[in-house]
Amino acid sequence: MLKACGVAERGGQTEFANTYAAWEALPEEEKAELEGLRVRHSIVASMRPFAEIPTEEERARWIKAVFNTRLGEEVPPDCDPDDFEKEHPLVWTHQSGRKSLVLGVSADRVVGMPLAEGRALISRLMEWTVQPDFTYRHDWKEGDIVLFDNPGALHRVLPYRGGSGRVMHRTTVSGVELIA
């Protein structure tokens, strides 16, 4: 859930992509090929737009940022950035039986597939998922609240000027619907 406590004068909208709808619109043959694939997700992959091959210093800085902003604690001295790598199914099934694609900027590679081929597949599926048929753009007004199903959605902010007053509060509801 996101709540707008302050909004930017220009920009700062949030785009949501429906990964359930993206999955459902794929051809049946492609769905059959994708079922059972697993994807490695990592913080390094999520930072790749800023540094294709990060230095050890950059990796350490990213890990520190995760600990400080998400966990509110110091990085343990024995922390390895690779500890922040997780494997998830490419196709996740909700307890209702509905399926969605598990994608995002952290999706790094497809397990058991050559690196370039797996990254090309991830890139193609991302492009498919964020097409207009599956997306919604929210133009924030102060006080707006948007509730979304995180395993069934991708979301991103559009550019806005720093210091614009944009302040968002995020609330995460936990439960049994984990992606594993």
Model regions and ranges:
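Non-heme Fe(II) oxygenase catalytic core, chiefly the N-lobe of the double-stranded beta-helix
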Residues: 1-145, 151-180
